[in-house]
Amino acid sequence: MSIEARLAELGVTLPAAPAPAANYVPFVVSGNLVHISGQISQNAAGLIKGKLGVDVTVEQGAEAAKCCAISLLAQLKAACGGDLTRVVRAVKLTGFVNSAPDFTDQPKVINGASDFLVAALGDAGRHARAAVSAGSLPLGVAVEIDAIFEIRV
């Protein structure tokens, strides 16, 4: 099944790729790898803000991470010239979780992105990963995730 068909089955429509918030590019294609800059937690309603262990639950954080993954796929689609059939696999995610000092469930939060990528890409969505605590994130968002994908050139 194609990525587009899986997304439709999941009820997900990719948004336009978000514009960078500062002096950087949203992605770099180097050889057969696409390095995607950090995507912050946002949806159609706006930024998903807050701190895990204070005012955001693990479940809400996982949903925020899923929103980051949707933005990652939007950037990936742009990097592939709109053709997601070029995607070979997800390679690596690095997830940053805006966390209270005693919060230790960062992996459960970033599972929201990992689970979504496996659902959207099948086995090609399985990836290496880091889930890291952050004392704060840009614009007060709950989650930020960057990624590396392999594509056909």
Q: Which ranges hold each PLM region?
A:
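Short, polar/acidic, helix-capping and beta-turn segments at strand->helix junctions
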Residues: M1-V153
